């Protein structure tokens, strides 16, 4: 129980939280995950495209180090030049590669990798929900159609993953498999009733303790209790929308505090963003809810266009029409705004709360975790 690691959350929902982990629990949880979910062995070479400020940095160091793997570090941005990551894999013969969906979406417009990626055996992804096209590209063009995508999700405060597939079982595209080893996970409605197996979207919760869980927030115990323990008695409420289908596969649908409520119909930003990114001219998207006198709330989608595509009213209409076709007319975005970039944390997560604040002309609050705050000024100018 001796303190081991003080690390900070991404800050996507507010001021970053200082998370305290201890020696035994963190080591056990991370090593178990790298060994049995990423299927790493002593002879493997691991590289996770991250900096040490994201929990996936310690994930690689602690788990990979405990297993005796070779660890590859790289300074600077993984996409400058555009093929840098693929050349690194080729040069170091990386076999376990970790990266975020956001990074994959940024790399995809540069074309298929030309480097020799035959050393790859496992792909590990985390950070945000997937869109089908980038997921398929990663599997087919990076992994050669042979490397499993271990799409996992947990959090800085979890000290491991709540949900994760393993290479030993079939994987459904964009899913997270199911509960990670030792995790008593559930999806519940507002009353706490289980929705697992129904495919309905509910809150992701954990019903039993686990070794890697944080011992609390640094000098802020009340915030820790408010964040996870005071919404449903006796369970950890993680703040993610999730579903588990009849085949036993689990999916995430974005943060529950990012949910839009359009004319009484709830939808997560991930669904709207996925529909927007499916347009061949859109690289990235962030969907936020904006107050509306009649509907209560409408969706605005902020899109980053792919190189070679000029933002026009016609293109905005096309993106909105695609969203309506995929999700229903009720969810057609009220506005599509093109911007050069979206504000992101150092772990490549889009800071939707800041996007929404700018859309409403409000103070975006704590931006200490935002790597490119200038993107918010671009948003303000675009409006």
Predicted regions mapped to residue ranges:
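Conserved pre-ATP/AMP-binding loop-to-beta segment of ANL
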Residues: 1-8, 15, 23-25, 39-45
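AMP-binding/adenylate-forming catalytic core of the ANL superfamily
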Residues: 90, 97, 210, 215-216, ...
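Conserved S/T- and glycine-rich ATP-binding loop of Class I adenylate-forming
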Residues: 3, 9-12, 34, 46, ...
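Glycine-centered tight turns that cap/initiate beta-strands
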Residues: 2, 119, 223, 281-284, ...
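Conserved helix-loop-beta element of the AMP-binding
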Residues: 44-47, 72, 95-98, 112-133, ...
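Generic structural signal for well-ordered beta-strand positions
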Residues: 17, 195-197, 251, 351-352
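Conserved AMP-binding/adenylation subdomain of ANL enzymes
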Residues: 27-45, 55-95, 110
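Conserved AMP-binding/adenylate-forming
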Residues: 121-123, 130-249, 256-259, 272
